[in-house]
Amino acid sequence: MRFIERYFYRPSPVQKGVALALLPLSLLYCTIATTRRALSLKREFPATLISIGNLVVGGTGKTPFLIALAKEYEDRVAVVSRGYKRGSKGLLVVSHEGKILEETPKSGDEAMLIAQKLPKATVIVSEDRAKGINKAIELGKDIIFLDDGFRFPYNKLNILLRPLLEPHFKLCIPSGAYRERPSLYQSADILAKEGKEYRREVNISNPTPRMLLVTAIASPSRLERFLPEVVGKIAYKDHAFFDIKTLQKAMKEHEASSLLVTEKDEVKLKESGLPLSVMRLEFFIDEEIRAHVREFVASRSPKLS
């Protein structure tokens, strides 16, 4: 577990002391976030908006959850994301109805993964989510999924994911891992708890005898329960791009026969020429959640026609 994960989830006595010392900053941050939410006016768009979000920093499975849910409506769907750590700015149409228009460095790893996993959908990245939504509507999409969209004051269905491992302190950053006050879980239209309303299963494609785990995801420790025996583990910052020569050197040092990577990391390494073993994720979402989403989509459709 990396330092920042230990600090938020399994802090040492020293880290607990640091968290308490930072409490005034945490309270200030939470107050600002709460005030901003209270003063925001809801905005309406002529489309069905469905947000997949969380309250904590780091990964809770938003992207695979979104992919699993959006598959049911794929022909009508656009996905709007910020495109974290991408090498471009502004609005970018990553894919349109299955045709991929950009490369991973410009789109970002998550947007490219969504584009590949939803081959009939349209994927848009934009720091300004409203511009992304309007572009999706312009392209004829009437169901729009927002990746990490909980904080935006739009008229939408809010799905919040609650992770299996929760932060030690129920405080906003920097004392805790929450981006907004934890009580906002109660404001979600759908609250999905990992292990109860959604779960994951992992299968490894192209396994080899000596796999070296290489990953650039927010919480690499969450992979532990799915891992086979590996010869080593290398964790980069979330969304980081890889240096091929560094990976080649690491493989040689560990006498590795392949790199074990997530699907999100695979999109950045497909053209590397390195042998890859990939952790293929299968996502299972409770049928009650799917039924709730169908009901919401059906209720919005007459208003949009």
UniProtKB/Swiss-Prot annotation:
One of its GO terms (biological process) is lipopolysaccharide core region biosynthetic process. It is an enzyme of class 2 (transferase). GO terms for molecular function: ATP binding; tetraacyldisaccharide 4'-kinase activity. It catalyses: a lipid A disaccharide + ATP = a lipid IVA + ADP + H(+). ATP binds at V56, V57, G58, G59, T60, G61, K62, T63. It holds the Pfam family LpxK. Pathway: Glycolipid biosynthesis; lipid IV(A) biosynthesis; lipid IV(A) from (3R)-3-hydroxytetradecanoyl-[acyl-carrier-protein] and UDP-N-acetyl-alpha-D-glucosamine: step 6/6. Keywords: ATP-binding, Kinase, Lipid A biosynthesis, Lipid biosynthesis, Lipid metabolism, Nucleotide-binding, Transferase. Signal peptide: none annotated. Its EC number is 2.7.1.130. The keyword Glycosyltransferase does not apply. InterPro entries: LpxK, P-loop_NTPase. It comes from the Bacteria. One of its GO terms (cellular component) is plasma membrane. The keyword Glycoprotein does not apply. Belongs to the LpxK family. Transfers the gamma-phosphate of ATP to the 4'-position of a tetraacyldisaccharide 1-phosphate intermediate (termed DS-1-P) to form tetraacyldisaccharide 1,4'-bis-phosphate (lipid IVA). This is Tetraacyldisaccharide 4'-kinase. It comes from Wolinella succinogenes (strain ATCC 29543 / DSM 1740 / CCUG 13145 / JCM 31913 / LMG 7466 / NCTC 11488 / FDC 602W).
